[in-house]
From Swiss-Prot:
The keyword Endoplasmic reticulum does not apply. The PY-motif is required for the interaction with RSP5 ubiquitin-ligase and the HSE-mediated gene expression. Component of a RSP5 ubiquitin ligase complex which specifies polyubiquitination and intracellular trafficking of the general amino acid permease GAP1 as well as other permeases such as PMA1. The RSP5-BUL1/2 complex is also necessary for the heat-shock element (HSE)-mediated gene expression, nitrogen starvation GLN3-dependent transcription and pressure-induced differential regulation of the 2 tryptophan permeases TAT1 and TAT2. GO terms for molecular function: ubiquitin-ubiquitin ligase activity. Keywords: Cytoplasm, Phosphoprotein, Repeat, Ubl conjugation pathway. Residues 1-65, 82-124, 145-196, 857-878 are annotated as: Disordered. Transmembrane segments: none annotated. It comes from Saccharomyces cerevisiae (strain ATCC 204508 / S288c) (Baker's yeast). This is Ubiquitin ligase-binding protein BUL1. The gene is BUL1.
Amino acid sequence: MAKDLNDSGFPPKRKPLLRPQRSDFTANSSTTMNVNANTRGRGRQKQEGGKGSSRSPSLHSPKSWIRSASATGILGLRRPELAHSHSHAPSTGTPAGGNRSPLRRSTANATPVETGRSLTDGDINNVVDVLPSFEMYNTLHRHIPQGNVDPDRHDFPPSYQEANNSTATGAAGSSADLSHQSLSTDALGATRSSSTSNLENLIPLRTEHHSIAAHQSTAVDEDSLDIPPILDDLNDTDNIFIDKLYTLPKMSTPIEITIKTTKHAPIPHVKPEEESILKEYTSGDLIHGFITIENKSQANLKFEMFYVTLESYISIIDKVKSKRTIKRFLRMVDLSASWSYSKIALGSGVDFIPADVDYDGSVFGLNNSRVLEPGVKYKKFFIFKLPLQLLDVTCKQEHFSHCLLPPSFGIDKYRNNCKYSGIKVNRVLGCGHLGTKGSPILTNDMSDDNLSINYTIDARIVGKDQKASKLYIMKEREYNLRVIPFGFDANVVGERTTMSQLNDITKLVQERLDALRKIFQRLEKKEPITNRDIHGADLSGTIDDSIESDSQEILQRKLDQLHIKNRNNYLVNYNDLKLGHDLDNGRSGNSGHNTDTSRAWGPFVESELKYKLKNKSNSSSFLNFSHFLNSSSSSMSSSSNAGKNNHDLTGNKERTGLILVKAKIPKQGLPYWAPSLLRKTNVFESKSKHDQENWVRLSELIPEDVKKPLEKLDLQLTCIESDNSLPHDPPEIQSITTELICITAKSDNSIPIKLNSELLMNKEKLTSIKALYDDFHSKICEYETKFNKNFLELNELYNMNRGDRRPKELKFTDFITSQLFNDIESICNLKVSVHNLSNIFKKQVSTLKQHSKHALSEDSISHTGNGSSSSPSSASLTPVTSSSKSSLFLPSGSSSTSLKFTDQIVHKWVRIAPLQYKRDINVNLEFNKDIKETLIPSFESCLCCRFYCVRVMIKFENHLGVAKIDIPISVRQVTK
C-alpha cells in the first residue's frame, strides 16, 4: 500500500524538498507555491550560515518568468465569493466550528462531500490561474532529483544567482589553445554554435533534428549551444534537465499508464464523465482528466521522477536527407499531477487525501519513497489551460504571428515506431482514428505525411539503472488532443512587409561575405587584419583596433536589431492609418492611376487582362449585354457613334484595350470547416460552463465587422480602350467562377521572415530568391573551408599588431553566426505546396437572393443612375447597353434569374470618362454542403504556415480571355 503523506514521514536520511514553515506542517496543509519558494530560500540560508542571501533575478526580470509552465492554482487564493459560498455549504462528518473545507473528503467515510451545489460545472470551473514560482519549477521539474539509489544523498534546496561569464566560459572549456568552430552541417544537417546568453534569455523549447536512418539514432539540438542551461548550485552530474528528457533511452518495464480526459474536473469517489474522442479544444479551454499508474510485476519498482505535461510540437520529415525536425513550441508542466515530496493543491480546487482509495480501487498520489508497489494502481489528477498565445521567446525573430497557437494539422505518423501510420480518412465520415481514446484524428486538411502539428498530454516515468547509473524512460504514454485556436487576427498594425524583412537579411549576409572577402585579400597580401575588416563598413570609425571587442556579440546585436524591427510597434505612421493607407505592400498592390481611390479602398490586390478583337461585321455593336438579360434592345451613346467615324479614318480594324481587376482584401474571414461529425460533437451547447464563458469572452474581443463570416468579395473592373482602337462597347462577362487556393509552406529551420500568400504564389519570384540564397549558402561553405585551411595564418595576421596584449582568437563565427547560417538554410529549404479546391463554393447562380420585382428595379436604378440624361455631368453615370440573344451561362428562358444575376453580382458597365468604363462585381461566397476537405484556420509558425486565397476567374465573351485574381483571405474560428 502506498505510504500516506500524513504519516511521520519521509524516508530515512532524506529531508523534504519543500520545507515547512511551521513544525506542525502536514501534507494536507494548503500552501501557495510562492510560500514554498520563500521557505526554501530560508532553509538554504540556514545551511550556508553567514554567506548571506541572494535574491533570484527571476523575481525581478519578467523575461525569466515561465508564464506557460502550468495552470496549477492555489486553493488558498481562490475567488472570495467562491470561498464564501463554500464556507456556508453543509458538510457531513465535520464538527461544528471546524475549519474543514467542504471540498475536502472526510477520512471517516468514503462518500462524496455534500456541498449544497453541483461541483461538476459550477464552482469547480472557477480555476485559479496562478503560476508556480520559477525556483519551484527549476528545482522540481527542470531537474530530475536523484537519490533513490544512494540513500545518503540529500536533495537540498538550491540557491539562485546569476551565472558569471567566467563560470560559463570555464564550464565550456579550459584549454588555452586556439580552436575554431565549424559551421558546416553534419550528417543530420544541424549546425553548431558557440554563442552565449545570460539567464534572462530563457528559452525552454528547442528545435531538434533527428535521423530517421535505420543505422542512426542520433538527435541533434540546433539550439543546445545557443542557449546555455540555467545555472544554479545543483550538481549537473547528478541531475538532468527536463529539456533533455526526450533523449533518454527507453526500456521495457511492466508498468501500465492510462490517461483519460473528462468533461469536468474529477472529484474523488465519484465516477467522472469521460470526454469524447472527437473533442476539439480552443484557446483558453480547460483540459481535465486523470492518470493511473500500475505496477504489473511482482516486485517493487523504483523511479526517479514522474512528469505530466501538455506539449505541442511541429514535426517535419525530410526523406531525402533522412532527417526528422521537431520544434517544441509549448510545454506546460502540471506540478500537482507530477511527483513531488509534498502535496500540491489542484488547480481545479478539488481536494483529496493522499493515499486514500478511490471508487475504482486506485490510490491517490505517489508516495515519497518513489516506489511503485506491485498490484497497486496510483491515480493523479491533472488540469491544463490552453494559453491564448505562446511565450515571446518562442520565436527568435520576434514575429507576433509565430507566437499564436497553430491548429492541429495532420498526424505524426513517425511517432512511437510509426504507431499511427495506419490511420486513414474515412470517405463517409471525413476523418479517421484508431478507434481508441487518445488516438489522433486525421482529417483531409491537405497536409502530407511529412508535416504535422501535434498536441499531446504526456506522462513519463523516469528510472535509473543502478548498475550503470544512467537514467532512462521506464514508461511513457501520450494522449493526443485536437486543438483549433480561436481566430485572433495575426496581422498587426505597423508590421513590416515581407520584402523589407528579406532585404534587411540579404544586406546583412552580403556585408558578412564582403568582410570575408576582405580578410582573404589581407591573407594574400600578408597584411594585418583589423577590427574594421571584420565588422564591416557600417561600423568604420567607431571600432578602434585597441579596443577589446567581441565580434560575435557585435554580429548578434545586428541580428537582434533586425528582430526588433519585426515587432509591431516599429515606426508606425498613424497618419497613414487614418487615411487608410496600405501597410503591407507585400500583400497588396498600389494602384497608380487613382491614388485617392487607393486610399479609400485600403489594402487591395489587382490584376490585368489585355484584350484584342478583330472587326467581324459592320454591326454597330460587337459585344453586348443580353447574355444575362435575354432581351432584344439596341442603343449606343451618341459619343460612341461620333468616335467611330473618327477612328475609321485611321484604317485600324481592331478593338483593343486593357481590363484592370481590383479587389479589396477583406477583414472578415471564412469560418473554420470540419467534418460534420466533428461539428456536431463540438457545438456550443456541448461545451462546459467554463468553456462557454471563455468562448463568449473571446468573442467580445473581436469587432463585430470582423466577427461576421466572409460572405462576398467586392471587385472593381476598369476597362480602358486604346487610343488607336475602333470604338466599341467594353467586353461583356460570360461567366464567373471561384475556387479556394490552399498554400502550405514549410522549412526544416526557423523561417526568419514573415511570409505571405503573394510571395508563395509567385513561383518566379520565389525561385529567384531561393537561387540567391543558394548562392549565399555555397559561398559560405566555400569560405568556411578556406578559413579552416588557413586558420593559423589568419590568426597570426589578426594578432600581429596586438603587441603585449593577450592573443585573441579569430573564428569563422565572427563573420557568420549559426543563427544567420540557419536563416540562410531556412530560405534555401523552403518548400511550397498549393492545392486548388474548385468544389468549396457554390456557383454564383445558386447564391442569388429572392427579391421582389420592385426591390430589384430600385437596386438597378440606384446603381446605374439615370440613363436618359444627356447632360455632361450625368454622362459619367450612363450605363452602356447593347443587344444580343446569347445565353451560355444561364438556362434558356430564365430572364428573372438573368436580371437578379445582373443586379446582385455583375451589375453594368458605367462610363466614367472618355474611353474608360467601370463595373462593380460582388462575388458571393457560400460553402457547398458536401465539402470533403477540412479547412483549418490560417496560421504561421516558425517552421510552417498555411494561407488561403480565393481565386476569382472572370471569363469574357467571344473567347476574349479570362481575368484571374487571387484575393488573400483568412480562415478563422470565431463563430459556433
